[in-house]
A protein has these predicted regions:
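Short, charge-rich amphipathic interface segments used for partner binding and complex assembly
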Residues: 48-62
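A short, basic/aromatic helix-end/turn motif that makes direct DNA contacts
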Residues: 22-25, 55
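Recognition helix of helix-turn-helix/homeodomain-like DNA-binding domains
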Residues: 25-41
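A short, Lys/Arg-rich alpha-helix, primarily the initiator
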Residues: 1-22
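Short, basic-rich loop-to-helix N-cap that marks the start of a DNA-contacting helix
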Residues: 37-52
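Short, charged recognition helix plus adjacent turn
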Residues: 13, 27, 32, 59-70
Length: 70
């Protein structure tokens, strides 16, 4: 689960649909990755693209720190 990314998305008002459009995938795929519903994470290139386009003022390591679901 990418809790930091989820929190910052809410603050910056960025949607799963916007991330999906940037990455060329469905919003549900983005949601599943961010919420930890799948074992797959973001590819490094995709994480860099998300950070550069939507969250340039936040560190990549902060945004994409994985947290385990309880």
């Amino acid at each position: 689960m990418y809790q930091n990314l989820l929190d910052i998305m809410k603050i910056e008002k960025i949607t799963f649909a916007q991330l999906g459009e940037l990455l060329g995938c469905r919003y549900q795929t983005v949601s599943d990755i961010i919420n930890g519903s799948t074992q797959k994470g973001f590819y490094y290139e995709d994480a860099m693209k998300i950070q550069k386009v939507f969250f340039p003022k936040y560190a990549l390591e902060f945004l994409f720190a994985k947290m385990n679901r309880i």
